[in-house]
Amino acid sequence: MFKFVMICAVLGLAVANPPVPHSLGRSEDVHADVLSQSDDVRADGFDSSLHTSNGIEQAASGDAHGNIHGNFGWISPEGEHVEVKYVANENGYQPSGAWIPTPPPIPEAIARAVAWLESHPPAPEHPRHH
């Protein structure tokens, strides 16, 4: 009787566990076609762009100094167009867009404290001679 109960319990768990999808993306993403693509590499920089049938877009331009600016976007699972613009240069990668999270504003009391500290630098320390 114990074996019968255990077999029923294992079968019950197996049936109750929903199957895990193999891909978290949309099924049409697998079959997306490239609608347009261009790459122009020159001695003084490059230009690149890509557009696919499922709404993925990318464009970038770079110069001889290593500065790059561009954008990329896609259609979210909710059907909204997501776009990110960016600059990459000596100051690093700097993305911008409505979808980029932003930090909360600095509380006024903290801003006042920082301003006070900046306007009152500490006195230089003098080494003690023993």
Swiss-Prot record:
Q: Which residues form the signal peptide?
A: 1-16
Name used for this protein in its record? Larval cuticle protein 1
Q: List, in alphabetical order, the Gene Ontology terms for molecular function in this entry.
A: structural constituent of chitin-based larval cuticle
Concerning Pfam families, the annotation shows: Chitin_bind_4
Q: Where does the record place the Chitin-binding type R&R domain?
A: 43-104
An example of a Gene Ontology cellular component annotation for this protein is: chitin-based extracellular matrix
> Would the keyword Amino-acid biosynthesis be found if you checked this record's keyword annotation?
no
Top-level taxon of the source organism: Eukaryota
Q: Which InterPro entries match?
A: CHIT_BIND_RR_consensus, Cuticle_Struct_Prot, Insect_cuticle
PANTHER family noted in UniProt: CUTICLE PROTEIN, CUTICULAR PROTEIN 65AU, ISOFORM A-RELATED
Tell me the organism. Drosophila melanogaster (Fruit fly)
